[in-house]
Regions:
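Helix-breaking motifs and short loop linkers at transmembrane-helix boundaries and internal kinks
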Residues: 40, 72, 93-98, 263, ...
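C-terminal membrane-cytosol helix-exit motif in multi-pass small-molecule transporters
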Residues: 170-189, 370-375
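Conserved MFS/SLC helix-loop-helix module at the cytosolic interface between two early adjacent transmembrane helices
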Residues: 59-93
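Cytoplasmic helix-loop-helix junction between adjacent transmembrane helices
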Residues: 103-142, 311
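Residue-level signature of mid-helix packing/kink "hotspots" within the transmembrane helices
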Residues: 54-62, 146-147, 248-253, 337-338
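Helix-loop-helix hairpin linking two adjacent transmembrane segments in secondary transporters
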Residues: 138-181
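Paired small-residue
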Residues: 98-106, 289-297
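C-terminal ends and interior cores of transmembrane alpha-helices
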Residues: 82-95, 274-286
């Protein structure tokens, strides 16, 4: 595929993924109000409903990779987008909290399929010397959807009703499925009846575990940044988090080719060490300037870590196993957030908010050690 059609195909996959994440983001500020309001349930129910999608997201990523390798990237992305649209339709069903949990389980499965198969599709489109950059840019579809989705959901709710939010949550991924059907696919799936290996790729385990340790810092920032700054009387928590998010985007846009230019393993080591530094700056911040600086350092490192590790994964497997490898790898992101959030929460409960960030520092340093020892060996 020549350069221009490949760029058009990349843009299409990006838009499809962003539409799916817009549906996820639009419901984030709306579902808690719906559970506490019209349904009249508890805060515990809010937590269960909100987090249910992570269960199937984790489980379906390797399966999505398997489908992408054996049936094609497009069919896996379309199936995932349609599954996400079903989730939006299920929000309309008046089945209380159990019905919402089922809807969120469908959403997790759909989102997991779209991002996993989409990642493999993007790598198929990328020249070998630009894979790291395109992997990083593709990840911005997640940030775009989760950043723009919540205000869209709020706007729809205030202008209309819960039902219109559900309609948007169904319509956005449905539009994505229609777009995906028109994107050309270069990859040739396995012949009928031929299985391309197990659901879990062993080559992804060590990079995936490194990623899990690295995303503990994201869990700490997401849960306790604002609370830590408020506790110290610093405030500006929203601005500090915005600085973190903006740096993630800027580094992906301006420095997204670092893994391609200097190598994914050195980038992964450096990103882990710099992430630890940023988290330490946040933990010791005594004013807004120090907190924002720490958040920006953390954001720059966090932005580089994922594409570096993903590039290691795709470099170790043949094209026909790329989907399974990326499915296994991306599942470790969910695992890291799923286990890292209660880990830093326990640290905060026992020793205060600052302790949550020191635990994340230790995890980031652990990621650097693994990248320096284990990943260096696998690349040699």
């Amino acid at each position: 595929m020549s350069r221009r059609p490949a760029l058009a195909a990349f843009a299409g996959v990006f838009v499809v993924t962003m539409l799916g994440l817009l549906a996820v983001g639009a419901t984030l500020p709306v579902l808690p109000r719906y559970v506490r309001g019209p349904i009249g349930s508890t805060d515990l129910a809010v937590g269960i409903v909100s987090g249910a999608f992570a269960v199937t997201g984790l489980a379906f990523r390797p399966l999505a990779g398997h489908i992408a390798d054996n049936r094609g990237r497009r069919i896996a992305v379309v199936a995932g987008a349609l599954t996400s649209a079903v989730a939006g339709v299920l929000y309309f069903v008046p089945a209380g909290v159990p019905g919402l949990i089922v809807a969120r389980l469908f959403l997790g499965a759909g989102e997991g399929m779209v991002f996993t198969a989409g990642s493999a599709w993007v790598v198929d489109l990328a020249p070998p010397d630009r894979r790291g950059r395109l992997i990083g840019l593709y990840g911005l579809a997640i940030w775009s959807g989760l950043s723009l989705g919540p205000p869209i959901g709020e706007l729809i709710l205030h202008a209309s009703s819960f039902e219109m939010v559900w309609a948007f949550a169904a319509g956005a991924p449905l539009l994505g499925a229609a777009i995906a059907l028109r994107i050309p696919e270069r990859f040739t799936p396995a012949a009928a009846g031929r299985d391309r290996g197990p659901l879990v790729a062993r080559e992804s385990l060590l990079p995936g575990f490194t990623l899990s340790l690295g995303v503990v810092g994201f869990a700490a920032v997401s849960a306790f940044l604002v609370l830590l700054l408020d506790e110290r009387g610093i405030g500006h928590g929203a601005a500090t988090f915005a600085a973190f998010a903006a740096t993630v985007v800027l580094v992906r846009l301006l420095g997204g080719d670092l893994p391609d230019r200097i190598g994914p393993v050195p980038c992964a080591i450096g990103a882990s060490l710099v992430e630890a530094l940023g988290l330490a700056l946040i933990a010791t911040a005594s004013g807004p300037a120090a907190a924002i600086a720490g958040a920006m350092v953390m954001g720059g490192a966090y932005s580089t870590l994922y594409p570096s590790l993903a590039l290691i994964v795709v470099g170790q497997v043949p094209e026909e196993r790329r989907g399974v490898a990326l499915g296994t790898f991306t599942a470790f992101f969910d695992l890291g957030v799923g286990l890292g959030s209660p880990l830093v929460g326990a640290a905060a409960a026992i020793s205060g908010y600052e302790a949550a960030f020191w635990v994340a520092v230790a995890c980031a340093l652990g990621a650097a050690v693994i990248a320096r020892t284990g990943l260096t060996r696998t690349r040699s």
